Amino acid sequence: MIRVLVVDDHPVLRAGLEAVLRTEPGFVCVGTAGDGHELLAALRHTRPDVVLLDWRLGDEDGLALCRTLRAEPAPPEVVLYTATVDPGLDGQAEAAGAHAVVEKSADIDDLFDTLRLAVRGGRQAA
């Protein structure tokens, strides 16, 4: 089972992603967080394989949180999740240690494929 921690400042989106993850074989949502403080607290007791992290997390910077996560001992993989298309984001995300960037409008199967690849250590094709 791939253990996913969902981090987004919108409660409805968090709940929706948690529900969708419950329906997909091979995935389990081990927790959710609405901000960076909740993320770091949840990280320690959920031990996810991958964190699905909103790029624009309220006033917080998802890239900075990604760097913080990657500095943890035994860090989880990170997939940035965004509603905003930004041509420079892929490079910034990779530099911050994220596995990939997925648009919130992407097909759910593409999201699942990206999460699987992240855990296996593969890179998403550009």
Short names for language-model regions:
Residues 54-55, 82:
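Active-site residues of response regulator receiver
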Residues 32-50:
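Acidic, metal-coordinating helix/loop segments flanking the phosphotransfer/catalytic sites
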Residues 93-99:
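As written
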Residues 58, 86:
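The feature encodes the CheY-like receiver
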Residues 88, 106-119, 123:
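C-terminal output helix
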Residues 9, 81-85, 104-106:
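Conserved active-site segment of CheY-like receiver
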Residues 63-74:
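Short amphipathic alpha-helix used as the core "switch/output" element in two-component signaling
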Residues 35, 61-64:
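Acidic catalytic/metal-coordinating carboxylates
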